[in-house]
A protein has these predicted regions:
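Cytochrome P450
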Residues: 1-451
């Protein structure tokens, strides 16, 4: 099929877009076809939500699934007792109909808490919950503040070398959460950049099968090296604790589960925060009036973080859950064993939950419902408090020190990440502008606009 023959995003091959609602006698609409390049996230979310609370979708490789797209339907689906995370319920995978190198395989098959249910899920989740306890996260605040200040110290020189511009995603939004989670987990510096690159490849939806298989193999190899380094020199970190659980006589963790847990902690522990910070900076630069509200004390940095999570969720469509029986979701029956996406991007702008102006970025918004961007129920992200803390500290320090910071290109020209699972810009070129120095960078919660 040539590029000219390719279907428009949102339309299965051989069909044409149709914005009009079907009449009662109309045949079912074709499954929604995701744009694997990650382009048009906002338009995709709008169309998915308009089609209904549960929408048939076509995933890469022609695999059929569903997406749950509206806030209340998604909230209920995420806690439904007859919805599973264990891929043994994934009918097409179980029956051998998923080809090798399928780009979404890792989401279904990684051995960890995101693919387990019941007692197994609680067992695999426990180490992460302990490592990310409220007391542990609160104790990390000074370290996050110091790292933030160090990274901001380097921005003027980087911008000077770039003719006044710098890629804020690469220079600030990435290294901050990667350093924090690596220190918490026990990942030596030599492994961090490669783990970031590989975790990006395994969530890409444009990767070819051979490259996907190679990336997964290398990711397991590098994580094995991380484990070997900690076995040789244990420390007060999560990896050392996981190794101890794996090596004890009544091993509470298998070697595969150890690797899978590390993969999830490293990937989710930095990528979501990286995208959250990137999206928040993009939104504030595009909506300077909202930044002014924070500076005037009419909103705080926690409000910015929460509104970014709702309005521009770092995770757009998260794989997978599987009904264990045919399940009616808002009038649509999802067949047993179907892979289902949690469409946080669509649910975050649901007018039924957030009002008729749900598409508007408004840091003073006080919704009556809880945001779902970090999940809901037993599988809610255990790293959410740390991600929120990092983002609040990063945004406050960034815009305090560089009050004139702005995008170096029009927002519409920002290139998306090559995936429909995650949602962010692949680069964030900015002009930092004047540097007012380190005054007010102590992170005090009593200062104006503190988070």
């Amino acid at each position: 099929m040539t590029e000219a023959d390719a279907p428009a995003p949102g339309t299965a091959p051989g069909s044409a877009p149709d914005a009009s609602p079907p009449s009662p006698s109309s045949p079912p609409s074709p499954p929604y076809l995701f744009d694997v390049t990650g382009a048009g996230h906002r338009e995709a979310a709008q169309e998915l939500r308009a089609r209904g609370p549960a929408v048939p979708v076509q995933l890469p490789g022609g695999v059929l699934g569903h997406a749950v797209t509206r806030h209340h339907a998604l909230r209920d689906f995420l806690t439904h007792p007859e919805v599973a995370k264990d891929a043994s319920h994934f009918a097409a995978l179980r029956e051998g109909r998923i080809p090798p190198g399928w780009p979404l395989t890792t989401f279904a098959t990684v051995d960890g808490m995101t693919t387990a249910d019941g007692a197994d899920h609680r067992r695999l989740r426990e180490p992460a919950v302990k490592a990310l306890s409220p007391r542990r996260v609160a104790a990390l605040r000074p370290r996050v503040e110091r790292l933030t200040a160090e990274l901001l110290d380097g921005l003027p020189a980087l911008a000077a070398r770039g003719g006044g511009t710098v890629d804020l995603r690469h220079a600030f939004a990435y290294p901050l959460p990667m350093r924090v989670i690596s220190e918490l987990i026990g990942v030596d510096e030599e492994f961090r950049d490669r783990l970031h690159q590989l975790s990006g490849l395994v969530v890409s939806t444009v990767i070819d099968p051979e490259a996907a298989l190679a990336a997964n193999r290398e990711l397991v190899e590098v994580l094995g090296q991380v484990v070997a380094a900690r076995r040789a020199a244990p420390g007060d970190d999560l990896t050392s604790a996981l190794i101890a659980a794996c090596d004890e006589a009544d091993a509470r963790l298998s070697e595969r589960e150890l690797i899978g847990t590390l993969l999830l902690m490293i990937a989710a522990g930095h990528q979501t925060t990286l995208d959250l910070i990137t999206n928040a900076v993009r939104a504030l630069c595009a909506h300077r009036d909202q930044l002014d509200l924070v500076r005037e004390g009419r909103a705080d940095w926690a409000d910015v973080v929460e509104e970014t999570l709702r309005h521009d969720s770092p995770v757009a469509h998260f794989p997978f859950r599987y009904p264990t029986r045919d399940l009616d979701v808002g009038g649509t029956v999802i067949p047993r064993g179907t892979p289902v996406l949690a469409s946080y991007a669509a649910a975050g702008r649901d007018p039924e939950a957030y009002g008729p102006d749900a598409d508007r970025f408004d840091v003073t918004r006080r919704p009556a419902v809880r945001r779902l961007s970090f999940g809901h129920g037993p599988h809610v992200c255990p790293g959410a408090p740390l991600a929120r803390l990092e983002a609040r500290i990063a945004l406050r320090a960034l815009f305090t020190r560089f009050p004139d910071l702005d995008l170096a290109v029009p927002e519409a020209e920002l290139r998306p990440l090559p995936t429909f699972v995650g949602n962010s810009a692949a680069e964030l070129p900015v002009r930092p502008g004047r540097d007012v120095g380190t005054a007010g960078q102590d992170g005090s919660a009593t200062s104006p606009g503190a988070g």
